[in-house]
Amino acid sequence: MLLTHLNEENQPKMVDIGDKETTERIALASGRISMNKEAYDAIVNHCVKKGPVLQTAIIAGIMGAKKTSELIPMCHSIMLNGVDIDILEEKETCSFKLYARVKTQAKTGVEMEALMSVSIGLLTIYDMVKAIDKSMTISGVMLEHKSGGKSGDYNAKK
């Protein structure tokens, strides 16, 4: 497989997307944070001293998507049309599953923005309740779906 982020001298470069067609691009990513019952209950009962955890995680996830190109060296800076975040409460496992859907009209995809959104949202939850549970785990951060562009659609295997 040809690595497009390397030049003829095997040095890093940013891929030129200037000749690519502008199309609608959508990416959906997800991830989970698991914690002890005390931390989970504090979040769902709105008893965390730092404020509303899930709402803050949503805002952080949106910010994460917008800042992706500043943190990932070969990622293009693109205008986002929208970032939608959903957080599901999973009481049985004392966990939260965060989904981020990112949409644009661009010459490159938004997979990295969706993955960054999930990661930053989950890290924000960790930050806000680490005083209650330092053993929280973030897992399963993955691309669920992407559409648009030359490579077409992708759906993760269930």
Swiss-Prot record:
InterPro entries: MoaC, MoaC_bact/euk, MoaC_sf, MoCo_biosynth_MoaA/MoaC, Mopterin_CF_biosynth-C_dom. Pfam families: MoaC. Signal peptide: none annotated. Pathway: Cofactor biosynthesis; molybdopterin biosynthesis. It is an enzyme of class 4 (lyase). Homohexamer; trimer of dimers. This is Cyclic pyranopterin monophosphate synthase. It comes from Helicobacter pylori (strain P12). The gene is moaC.
